Amino acid sequence: MFMDATHPQHNPVISCGWIKRGEEHPIKSNTGRRRLNINGAIDVQRMSAQIRFDDTIDAISTIALFEQIERANPLAKRITIICDNARYYRSKAVSEYLENSRIDLLFLPPYSPNLNLIERFWKFFKRQVLYNHYYEAFNDYKNACKRFFRELDSYIPRLRSLLTENFEIIGN
């Protein structure tokens, strides 16, 4: 599994548009100060995700995600999760939880988001939900994000081609 958090803001992300030269096209926007905190892990073998919407991403919300992952994988003896070096993944509370857990964390080298497949997943999520979409109310925005995860099965064919573990080893 690959794990990371994302923090999309309640504001449209304009990815492309065709506007005739000399014309203006107003784009609706919000304050952009409200955002969601989404912590998640994706299993690229089964194309399934465990997702949490939390007020903040910290050690407590990370442990809650671990518990959710363990409940979703009752038959697994060990669960390896690949993640970045976020402070909350290395916290004392998380380390203590992992001592009696079936989860093993495998930390990626610093500054290597290209090795964490969930980064591609988050980009796909944002492309589907945020790009060129305007949500007047924050609740509409939050519901659209939640709908994406509820309907994740409909995206599996595209995700299978996007979330491949084709890494090339270079150097020694």
Question: In which residue ranges do the predicted regions lie?
Answer:
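Structural signal for conserved beta-strand scaffold positions within catalytic alpha/beta enzyme cores
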Residues: F2, I51, F107-P109, Y131
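Short, conserved catalytic/metal-binding motifs centered on acidic residues
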Residues: F2-P8, G40, M47, I81-N85, ...
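Catalytic-core regions built around general acid/base machinery
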Residues: A93-R102
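RNase H-like two-metal-ion nuclease catalytic core shared by retroviral integrases
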Residues: C83-N85, K92, L106-Q128, F138-Y141
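Extended, low-complexity cationic-aromatic segments
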Residues: M1-E67, N166-N172
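RNase H-like polynucleotidyl transferase catalytic core
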Residues: H25-T31, S101-L117, Y134
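C-terminal anion-handling pockets and recognition modules
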Residues: E119-N172
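Short, basic/hydrophobic alpha-helical segments
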Residues: S61-I79
